[in-house]
């Protein structure tokens, strides 16, 4: 991912500054605007602006938030930390947010190695995996990249599935020139695949399990809207 690459490359540059550069279009891949989640391939040319190196600005996350996250931890080992991320809480700072889950945990555990192995949308709740050392981060990143991690989400959908199991294989992209616009199905988009399984129906609504075989931004809602 572009953001992970830049964090590694621009050591000492605050993450908030890196995400701001991406969001404002200052970072380009092969001459085109990029997203934080853009995947880099061998031979890609990445253009970045001059960046001032300085320590991260201190972040002060409220004690009640940090307590909530401590209570949300589901599993912990010397390599991993897994917690049930609450809906409405971003995983990292950026886009006008001064802190995220990773910042709160780092404040709560000063001096510990903690890195996000993946991301969840701000409004999505569920299992968030963090690495507790560099080797674990490398292995987890490879598993997410290679698709060996199974990602399943429970969703309440407005409308009914036409069948008990529906595969949506439709490319996704934002509207041209809109870095923060909605993600929609577009022929020129990135390959995206979601499998919806019906769990229960409630009149005009249904409760489904959505399994992601790709990891595009807003993939579930875009594919659900496409059914």
Task: Please give the residue ranges for each predicted region.
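RNA pseudouridine synthases
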Residues: 1-227
């Amino acid at each position: 991912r572009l953001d992970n690459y830049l964090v590694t490359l621009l050591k000492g540059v605050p993450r908030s500054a890196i995400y701001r550069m991406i969001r404002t279009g200052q970072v380009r891949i092969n001459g085109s605007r990029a997203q934080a989640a853009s995947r880099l391939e061998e031979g890609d040319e990445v253009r970045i602006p001059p960046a001032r190196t300085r320590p991260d600005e201190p972040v002060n996350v409220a004690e009640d938030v940090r307590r909530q996250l401590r209570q949300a931890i589901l599993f912990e080992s010397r390599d991993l930390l897994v917690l049930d991320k609450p809906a409405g809480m971003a995983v990292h700072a950026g886009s006008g947010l001064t802190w995220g889950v990773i910042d709160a945990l780092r404040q709560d555990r000063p001096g510990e190695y903690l890195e996000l192995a993946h991301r969840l949308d701000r409004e999505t709740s569920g299992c968030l995996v963090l690495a507790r050392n560099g080797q674990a981060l490398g292995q987890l990143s490879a598993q997410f990249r290679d698709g060996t991690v199974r990602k399943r989400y429970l969703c309440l959908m407005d409308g009914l599935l036409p069948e008990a199991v529906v595969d949506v294989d439709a490319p996704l992209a934002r509207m041209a020139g809109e870095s923060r616009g909605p993600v929609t199905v577009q022929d020129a988009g990135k390959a995206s695949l979601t499998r919806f399984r019906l769990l229960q129906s409630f009149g005009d609504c249904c409760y489904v399990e959505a399994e992601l075989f790709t990891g595009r931004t807003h993939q579930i809602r875009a594919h659900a809207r496409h059914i």
